[in-house]
Amino acid sequence: MKRRAILFFLLFLLQMGSVPTLAAEPTVAAQGAALIDGKTGRLLWGKNADAPLAMASTTKIMTAILVLEQASLTEVVTVSKNAAQQPKVHMSLQEGEQWQAGALLSAMLLRSYNDAAVALAEQVSGDVAKFCAEMTKKAKEIGARDTVFGSPNGLDSHLTAEQHHSTAYDMALIGAYALENETFREIIAQQEIHVSDLTGKHPCSVTNADRFLQEYSGALGIKTGYTNRAGHCFVGAAERDGVRLVSAVLGSGWGDAGKQKKWTDTKALMDYG
């Protein structure tokens, strides 16, 4: 009799819609993926979330954090030979050019310019090696569990996996931390900007490479990445009804298929959340 009463009660709840249905597990191609609560850092879903992987240009999120916390956006950056020689993607900075730090930061975040990242790193710390050590230290302070930076722009062909790696969880956590900075949020939300060096002789129109920002309701954006080692990567964020979710997908694939997969992986994670 007791079992029958319980059964009738459960049937009643189902009819009333009071029994919550569990969201379907997301299908994600990425080698490593994480979805976290953007306010608490709690892991909501993961796939190899703590596996050390290359993270490509999502690295530049941490570069931006240090620039925002340690430099003035109006200070003048003089481009070094090292910065000017960085490979594509670059904004063709020339040795000796002078730019405001804010212009380089915005261009770096929107279009992933490698030369801008190095110029900013040298401005903040004097040289790239010192800047990378500060990046790694900051990651630990934020709560990252297995992240080492050997490059301010994410290029990794000259580095071993031990010298430059992170995890999907750590990159999501770093992304969530960056979003607490209002200037960071304002920069990544822009669709297009126009910047120039101080002389006005090197104008540059920069469009945002983040498709997620346009294709997903509530998207806040953040940062794409790709190297031959890392594959296509993306750290993304969205906010609806006051709930902020941050995701990271590392190694979503290679070639055109991988480029598309990082978007579908991210959307699947956000839909699950």
PLM feature segments, named:
Residues 21-182:
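Active-site-adjacent loops and short helices of periplasmic peptidoglycan-processing enzymes
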Residues 3-23:
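Sec-dependent N-terminal signal peptides of Gram-positive bacterial secreted proteins and lipoproteins
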Residues 15-16, 72, 269:
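Hydrophobic alpha-helical membrane context
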Residues 144-145, 159-273:
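Domain-terminus/edge residues, biased toward the C-terminal soluble/receptor-binding domains
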Residues 4-5, 37, 157, 267:
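Catalytic-site microenvironment of enzymes
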Residues 11, 136, 270-271:
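Generic solvent-exposed, charged/amphipathic alpha-helical segments
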